[in-house]
Amino acid sequence: QSMGGYVAASIAPRLRPHGLILMCPGAGMWYGCARRADMVTQSGKDYADLEGLVYKMAFNYNMAAHPDPFEEAKGYNGPVIVIRADDDKLVDDESCKRYAGLYQVAEFVRVSGGGHNFATIPSRTACEQAIWKFIQDNL
């Protein structure tokens, strides 16, 4: 999920897994990450807190050195499901649609509620059902 989806999408063209499950893949963090890190460190802090996810600004500087996440993800040809909650404040619909558009066999599923972590029983259930269907259909 999130940064894990970003990493999975980036490594999939080389690893070539049987399928790819991307839950709210976090490519959006890549855009402007060094500039955001500069602003945070200028305020006297060396970390950020996003919905309880605390990370050092060195992480942002390391991310800035990587290529565009969508370029890294190109070249994987297996089945893909991209899942996002419709009220996710950290990963936008456009990033998820862009990931889905990179792949030949991809499905984009939007789950109602639950935020970035699918933090309600109905959203978690819908997410798990979408994943189970994807596994049954593709793997």
Residue ranges and their predicted role:
Residues 1-4, 8:
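Gly/Ala-rich beta-loop-alpha elbow adjacent to hydrolase catalytic centers
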Residues 5, 115-116:
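Conserved glycosyltransferase catalytic-site signature
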Residues 11-12:
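Aromatic pocket-lining residues of Rossmann-like dinucleotide-binding sites
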Residues 15-94, 98, 104-110, 115, ...:
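The alpha/beta-hydrolase serine catalytic core
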Residues 135-139:
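Short, hydrophobic alpha-helical segments
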